[in-house]
Amino acid sequence: GLGRERFSERQHLLDSLDDSAVAQSSGGQAMRSHTEHALDLLTSPAAQSAFDLSKESEAIRDRYGRDHRGHCYLLGRRLIEAGVRFVTVTVIQPPEHVGRPGYGQTNGVFLNWDHHEGIYQNGPCGGPQGNSNQERYGLPHPVMMPSLDRSFSALVEDMDQRGLLDDTLVCFVTEMGRTPKVNKHGGRDHWSRAMSIAFAGAGCPGGAVIGATDKHGGDVTERLYTPYDYAETIYRKLGIPESRRLEKPGGVAVNLSDGGKPIRELF
C-alpha cells in the first residue's frame, strides 16, 4: 500500500508540476479538476472505510473466498459502493503468502495467466525450459481456476443483488488468447487470433455467448470483433458519443476507438 507520508509527498510533487505553462492551459486546468476530485475521493471517509473488509458479513466473505483473490474482488465491489467510478482489480499475491503450499517466491507472484509452462501441475509454474521465473509466470491452473470461478461469480451475483449492475459495467478482459495446443513445456504461448472477454451489467444481456471459434479454439468462425470494437462498446455504454475526439497539443485530433463499432448484441 501507499502510506500517508508517501501520498503527501506525491501531492506536493504534483503541485510543483502544476506551475508549468501546460498546466495553466484550459486542458491542464480541466485535468487538475479531475485530479483534485480523485484525491478527495481517495482521502474521503467513505473510501477509507471501503478498505475495511471486516465490515462485511461472514457469509459474504465466504462467498467471495477468504484467499487473496476473494479479498481483491470484494474490495472492488466496496470501492464501487463508495463512489469510485473506475476500478481495476489486479490480483497480486502478497509477500505474506510466501511459503504456503503451491505458492511463489520472495516477493510474491502475479496471480495471472501467463502460463508458458507447467500449467497442469500442482506447484508453481516455472519459466521457459524449466528455469524458475515465478514472478512472471504465476500459479498453475489447479490453483488459479477454482478461486477465479468462485470470486468472479460472487462479484457479479453480489452486485446484481445490490442493484449495482444497473449502472456499472463489469469487464473481464485479457490482452490476448493462448495457443490452442499445449507446447513442449506443458504450457500455452501467446495467441492473437482468438480470445474471449466477458461483460456484465450496464444493460448487457446475461447468459449470451456472442461469436464462435473452430473446434480447436484457434480461429474465429462467427462474429469477429476487434479491440477497437471492444473499446467503442465501453465508450457507448459510458454515454460517450462515437463522434467524440481527444485533441493533442497543437490541435491534432485523436479518435477514441479508431473507427470501432459497438458490439450490437450488448445493446
Regions found by a protein language model. Name each.
Residues 1-267:
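Ligand-binding pockets and gating/stacking loops
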